[in-house]
Amino acid sequence: MEQLLHYVWKHKLFPLTALCTTSGKPVEVIDPGLHNRNAGPDFFNAKVKIDGTLWVGNVEIHNKASDWYVHRHDKDERYDNVVLHVCGCVDTEAKNSKGEALTQMALDIPDKVMKNYRELLSVDQYPPCYQIIPSLTSLTVHAWMNALQTERLEQKTNAIEDRVRRCNGDWENAYFVTLARNFGFGVNGEAFEEWAFHIPLQAVGHHRDDILQIEAIFMGQAGLLELNTIPERYQKDALNDGYFAKLRNEYKYLAHKFNLTPMDYRQWRFLRLRPQNFPHIRISQLAHLYYQRKAGLSQLVEAASVEDAKKVLATAVTPYWETHYTFGSTSVRNDKNLSPFSLNLLCINTVVPILFAYGRHRGEEKYCDRAFDFLEQLRPENNYIIRLWQQCGLVVDNAGDSQALIQLKKEYCDKKECLRCRFGYEYLKL
């Protein structure tokens, strides 16, 4: 319940009874202070009047006063300027590292707040705060959605910056890894990222004019050129159709030339995947995109519009895959271009965060601004998360809105972080 005490203090949701210290002195909270989520006191620079005297300093909050000693704050000089120790239960006197007794105050959580909080944690329906959504003002909704959208973009930017570091500062390589991850479309995202780190782009660049060799390296590094990766019923046809053997021979030569080691093919997931999302198809599309030389980082960041970005990423498969989904398994001829739906998702999850991260890296606001513009222009995702929020009455106009709601579910609802959510704040005030 300590986090709930933090929440009550931060938002001044105090009980109707007057606040007072354990010695009976009246307390008036002028400013609860700045919430600190790192090491040190819980709230910085709070302003409280105690018995008519204004105190400015830090506030520490605990379930029980004795937690002060459990956390060894009595040995830590950073807590010497705590002007008020707020506790759910004051079960002992507390002293700082100088041996000085702290001013302490017992804070009760209002019954209404406690009731609403327990409801939020126990409701099985998603979102648990669905009852409050229709009554929220548009200002409250838009402010929180904008904050969530920025938070999600920052999160993706941090992931890209981590890839840049892993790629020794090579932004082109980090962009390729990011694009590859998003070609996994969720289910195979991690496998595609691992695969991309196994692709030596400098080596592949020497063979960029030969689509067969590009696809051989791409498929080989995915671990998909071993016979045992093909379902047994298709192995004979794969050996007879010639293409599998041709790729395997090319890869054998190139693997020796560049000292390549493939990833473990068992990382790929096929169960309940639509054939269009099979790794073979997505890898062939990436090979074709790389061969076309039109989807490099420079082309992407200079895309002036969403349509330009989609043209950069538009790709198909090599001819063999127009009639196959795996080696040896024939299908009706299909050009297997990236669908408009897939291009929309790639723009949301690759183009936008790359633009934002690259703009921040270069200190060029035009790229960051374009990232937000693209989010407003792109269609929203259509998945169960978005549909549930729409059923609650939220309007989802664009990809910025859908990204905000995905962030809300993953980082707040799923983690029961209602106390950090503005919708949760409104619910607790009911």
Question: What residues fall within each predicted segment?
Answer:
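N-terminal "leader" segments that precede or initiate the main folded domain
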Residues: M1-Y7
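N-terminal ordered "arm"
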Residues: Y7-S66, Y79
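Catalytic micro-motifs at enzyme active sites that drive phosphoryl/nucleotidyl and oxygen chemistry
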Residues: P32-R37, N45-I50, W68-K75, V90-N96, ...
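Short Cys/His-based metal-binding microdomains
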Residues: N63-S66, K75-V82, G88-V90
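Short loop/turn segments at secondary-structure transitions that flank enzyme active sites
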Residues: A65-D67, V90-T92, D111-V113, F185, ...
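Compact, glycine/acidic-enriched structural inserts
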Residues: V82, V86-W144
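Hydrophobic, aromatic-lined core segments that form the binding pocket/scaffold
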Residues: Q149-A404, E417
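Cysteine-cluster motifs in flexible loop/terminal segments that predominantly coordinate metals
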Residues: Q403-L430
